[in-house]
């Protein structure tokens, strides 16, 4: 649906889109990062809409105006964090899990802050993390 420079810009774009066509509030935010084995670098926020929901939007939504992302095999996990973005250690554990299972992860990471809750210690964020697979090294 769109590429935004950061989550704040993504939220503004989401409100703009959701106010134009009923149902576009089902857009998801994915922070796009790269991982070089030590550090994470953020590259902005993508607004994604699941194509399976398109039929529910009616004729007001023209999907041909938006780029489609390709389906890719990914290493996937859900973790809790005190931050809205994953730490390098979280991503390193995903890479390690992949290696253990014969999967080589690419350097790209997509993070979605699915939900958050607050307690006496502050905010906790539930992060959904995807790392596209570069290649299958060996079958388990």
Name these PLM-found stretches.
Residues 1-140:
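A solvent-exposed interaction/effector surface
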């Amino acid at each position: 649906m769109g590429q935004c420079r950061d989550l704040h810009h993504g939220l503004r774009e989401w409100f703009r889109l959701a106010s134009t066509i009923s149902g576009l509030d089902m857009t998801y935010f994915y922070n796009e990062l790269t991982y070089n084995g030590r550090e994470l670098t953020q590259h902005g926020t993508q607004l994604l809409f699941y194509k399976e929901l398109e039929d529910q939007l009616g004729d007001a939504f023209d999907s041909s105006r938006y780029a489609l992302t390709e389906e890719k095999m990914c290493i996937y996990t859900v973790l809790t964090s005190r931050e809205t973005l994953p730490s390098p250690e979280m991503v390193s554990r995903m890479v390690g899990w992949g290696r253990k299972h014969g999967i080589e992860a690419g350097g790209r990471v997509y993070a979605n802050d699915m939900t958050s809750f607050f307690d006496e210690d502050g905010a906790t964020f539930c992060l959904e993390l995807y790392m596209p697979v570069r290649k299958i090294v060996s079958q388990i």
